[in-house]
């Protein structure tokens, strides 16, 4: 599910939300579709030119992430210039060059407005394999973060649901491929419980050899769906069994507590009356 404009409209796109920047690096997008399209267009153009001029040099995943962030910053700078400096007859260049003749308060105010200029929210996972191995980066309005050590990343409104599945499975970067495939699919399906997450699922695989990018087709996705549903049924059955065990256990505790209370009541009746607090305790004990 992608978001358009001010976030008031959400829609399921007819195109995949992942895009192969190279045959070894893929971008997965979440958030505002307009800003994502604008960034992606420029990033893809730069990468294509890089491949054309240096066809034998593999692009690093980190370089792709830095490029994505750099393009976003340029777009933000240009929009801020048009919205804030444009009405004043200024550009970034003339604003910087003319600061000596401007009041300090004016410069500080404009600088603050430029730095805090609002942009649409977006998140992008850039993942792939380069000559240094496999990598996972997340680029957003707030910078670049590397998730190589963690071994997984999730973005969008369903990210917490997906992350919880990876955490519960104790997933790491050394996990086997067969474990990761089903876990990834199941995490996506569980994330559909979150508002704004659509049912459409796109999957791909990169590696183990650099330059190998494979789109997971519909037949495989259908098989994964069957496996996921069987897993869900097993989990639901296990939960029902556990609830039944807890019910029987608490019932047993209640019965034992009732017997104990009845026994205490009987001893009180046999003894005549229950002693009050402090009763039978002498304030003047005699020496024997």
Task: List PLM regions with ranges.
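A short, hydrophobic secondary-structure junction motif
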Residues: 122-126, 189-194
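Short acidic/polar capping segments at secondary-structure boundaries
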Residues: 131-133, 143-144
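Conserved short S/T/G-enriched processing/targeting/catalytic segments and their helical context
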Residues: 1-110, 117, 144-182, 197, ...
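Short beta-strand scaffold segments in enzyme catalytic cores
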Residues: 1, 118, 122-129, 135-137, ...
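Flexible, glycine/charged-enriched surface loops at secondary-structure junctions
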Residues: 177-181, 190-205
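Domain-length cofactor-binding catalytic modules of enzymes
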Residues: 137-139, 151-152
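Generic recognition of flexible, low-complexity loop/linker segments
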Residues: 112-114, 191
């Amino acid at each position: 599910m992608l978001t358009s404009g001010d976030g008031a409209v959400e829609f399921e796109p007819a195109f995949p939300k992942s895009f192969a920047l190279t045959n070894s690096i893929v971008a997965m997008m979440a958030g505002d579709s307009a800003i994502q399209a604008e960034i992606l267009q420029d990033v893809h153009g730069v990468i294509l030119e890089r491949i054309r001029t240096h066809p034998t040099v593999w692009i690093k995943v980190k370089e792709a992430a830095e490029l994505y962030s750099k393009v976003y910053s340029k777009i933000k700078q240009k929009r801020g210039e048009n919205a804030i400096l444009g009405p004043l007859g200024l550009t970034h260049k003339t604003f910087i060059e003319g600061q000596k003749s401007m009041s300090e308060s004016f410069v500080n105010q404009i600088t603050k407005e430029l730095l805090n200029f609002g942009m649409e929210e977006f998140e992008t996972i850039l993942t792939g394999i380069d000559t240094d191995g496999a990598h996972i980066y997340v680029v957003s309005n707030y910078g670049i973060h590397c998730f190589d050590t963690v071994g997984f990343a999730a973005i969008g409104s369903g990210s917490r649901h997906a992350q919880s599945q990876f955490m519960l499975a104790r997933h790491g970067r050394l996990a086997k491929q067969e474990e990761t495939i089903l876990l990834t699919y199941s995490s996506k399906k569980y994330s559909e419980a979150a508002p704004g997450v659509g049912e459409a699922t796109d999957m791909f695989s990169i590696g183990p050899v650099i330059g190998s990018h494979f789109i997971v087709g519909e037949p495989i996705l259908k098989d994964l769906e069957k496996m996921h549903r069987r897993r869900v049924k097993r989990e639901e059955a296990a939960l029902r069994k556990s609830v039944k065990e807890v019910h029987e256990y608490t019932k047993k505790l209640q019965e034992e507590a009732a017997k104990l209370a009845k026994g205490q009541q009987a001893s009180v009746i046999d003894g005549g009356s229950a002693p009050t607090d402090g009763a039978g305790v002498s304030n003047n004990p005699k020496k024997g």
